[in-house]
Swiss-Prot record:
GO terms for cellular component: cell outer membrane. SUPFAM superfamilies: Prokaryotic lipoproteins and lipoprotein localization factors. It is found in: Cell outer membrane. Pfam families: LolB. This is Outer-membrane lipoprotein LolB. It is a lipid-anchor. It comes from Vibrio cholerae serotype O1 (strain ATCC 39315 / El Tor Inaba N16961). The gene is lolB.
Length: 205
């Protein structure tokens, strides 16, 4: 395991156990789905919190996460079960920046590479901007469930093929109307698996 992770996560060996949920029957794209896509693309400023479970051949971890997105910036904070910050990532037009627990600052143009080099975690941050909303932007293939929201998608990102399974949605109010947003999804790439369970969505104007 990466030395930085060992220092940051003393004694953290438990994996977040998250039960799977069956996907609803698939249904072809229709006008309702196209309208839903347009609505999702209008959401530019939001926050969410939840749990992230990470499984790879060389490590298994569980984190609390906070995700904030605005038109100018994306931020991701991972913390352990004691509330100690493991990763504090900021991404803007200047690139990606990570500030560590001991006030060291690291930069890279690619957020995924920066996280991987510092922690050994392979998290497709920039693709998650759309995936976490339920948007299949430039996906190689995607399928819908019977509610006309995403059931699965597959996308080649940075030479890696990621498969995303949307296991559960919740209704969140947006512009005085409820819209379905993901609250449980699983990302898979080769032998790496990431489980996200979202406990709170906050959509901002």
């Amino acid at each position: 395991m990466n030395a930085l992770v060992r220092r940051l996560l003393p004694g953290l060996a438990s994996l977040l156990l998250l039960a799977g949920c069956a996907t609803a029957p698939l249904q072809p794209v229709n006008v309702q789905w196209q309208s839903h896509q347009v609505t999702l693309e209008q959401i530019q400023h939001y926050q969410l919190t939840g749990k992230l479970g990470y499984i790879a051949p060389d490590q298994r971890q569980s984190f609390n996460f906070q995700w904030q997105k605005s038109p100018q910036k994306l931020s991701l904070r991972l913390s352990n079960f004691l509330g100690q910050t493991v990763l504090n990532l900021q991404v803007d037009e200047q690139g990606a920046r990570v500030e560590t627990y001991d006030d060291q600052i690291y930069r890279d143009q690619d957020a995924q590479s920066l996280i991987r080099n510092l922690t050994g975690l392979d998290i497709p941050v920039e693709q998650l901007e759309d995936w976490i909303l339920g948007l299949p932007t430039q996906a190689t293939h995607y399928e819908l469930n019977e509610q006309n929201t995403l059931a699965t998608l597959t996308k080649l990102a940075s030479t890696e093929e990621w498969h995303v399974e949307y296991q559960r949605y919740q209704a969140i109010e947006w512009q005085h109307q409820p819209i379905p947003l993901p609250d449980k999804l699983k990302l898979q790439q080769n032998k790496t698996s990431i489980q996200l369970v979202i406990s709170q969505w906050t959509l901002l104007p």
